[in-house]
């Protein structure tokens, strides 16, 4: 999941800025992202008592896979706002699901070390994906990078189903 999101992240920022006509719209769209994520966390907390955290990760993966197919076709600021709200919701599912999963699969004595290793590798793969995305953008269209990320998200969802 981290690889797929990092692959498109720099291009999405440029894409959002180019749709709007002001930095106010740009700031508002990112505010919607943060606010929508914040507002769903209490619900996710209650739902995590009833549902396995992998379901949150699965919803994030497949929701992002579908959403990224739509992103290259965004043509208005209102559409950017809607996408930002959905990105915030899916991002919250991913963050919440991964933290619960990490807590469930680590022992308290080794937890700090394992979480450190987890964050190291996710940061390394995120950085590699950002660099690869820049390289690929020189040879393909930015839209193709969004579609490739969509495929990666979908595949990560399939992998979660197989490991569940």
Swiss-Prot record:
<dbReference type="GO" id="GO:0022857">
    <property type="term" value="F:transmembrane transporter activity"/>
</dbReference>
<keyword id="KW-0472">Membrane</keyword>
<feature type="transmembrane region" description="Helical">
    <location>
        <begin position="25"/>
        <end position="45"/>
    </location>
</feature>
<keyword id="KW-0812">Transmembrane</keyword>
<feature type="transmembrane region" description="Helical">
    <location>
        <begin position="141"/>
        <end position="161"/>
    </location>
</feature>
<keyword id="KW-0813">Transport</keyword>
<dbReference type="InterPro" id="IPR020846">
    <property type="entry name" value="MFS_dom"/>
</dbReference>
<dbReference type="InterPro" id="IPR011701">
    <property type="entry name" value="MFS"/>
</dbReference>
<dbReference type="InterPro" id="IPR036259">
    <property type="entry name" value="MFS_trans_sf"/>
</dbReference>
<keyword id="KW-1003">Cell membrane</keyword>
<keyword id="KW-1133">Transmembrane helix</keyword>
<dbReference type="GO" id="GO:0005886">
    <property type="term" value="C:plasma membrane"/>
</dbReference>
<feature type="transmembrane region" description="Helical">
    <location>
        <begin position="120"/>
        <end position="140"/>
    </location>
</feature>
<comment type="similarity">
    <text>Belongs to the major facilitator superfamily.</text>
</comment>
<dbReference type="Pfam" id="PF07690">
    <property type="entry name" value="MFS_1"/>
</dbReference>
<protein>
    <recommendedName>
        <fullName>Uncharacterized MFS-type transporter YitZ</fullName>
    </recommendedName>
</protein>
<dbReference type="InterPro" id="IPR050497">
    <property type="entry name" value="MFS_MdtG_subfamily"/>
</dbReference>
<feature type="transmembrane region" description="Helical">
    <location>
        <begin position="63"/>
        <end position="83"/>
    </location>
</feature>
């Amino acid at each position: 999941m981290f690889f797929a999101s990092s692959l498109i992240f720099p291009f999405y920022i440029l894409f959002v800025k180019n749709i709007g006509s002001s930095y106010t719209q740009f700031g508002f769209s990112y505010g919607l992202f943060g606010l929508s994520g914040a507002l769903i966390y209490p619900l996710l907390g209650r739902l995590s008592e009833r549902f396995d955290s992998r379901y949150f990760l699965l919803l994030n993966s497949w929701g992002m896979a579908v959403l990224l197919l739509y992103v290259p076709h965004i043509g208005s600021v209102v559409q950017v706002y809607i996408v930002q709200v959905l990105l915030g919701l899916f991002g919250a599912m991913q963050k919440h699901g991964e933290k619960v999963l990490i807590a469930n699969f680590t022992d308290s004595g080794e937890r700090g070390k394992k979480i450190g290793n987890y964050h190291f590798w996710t940061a390394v793969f995120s950085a590699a994906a950002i660099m690869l995305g820049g390289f690929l953008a020189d040879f393909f269209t930015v839209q193709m990078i969004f579609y490739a990320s969509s495929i990666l998200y979908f595949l990560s969802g399939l992998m979660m189903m197989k490991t569940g």
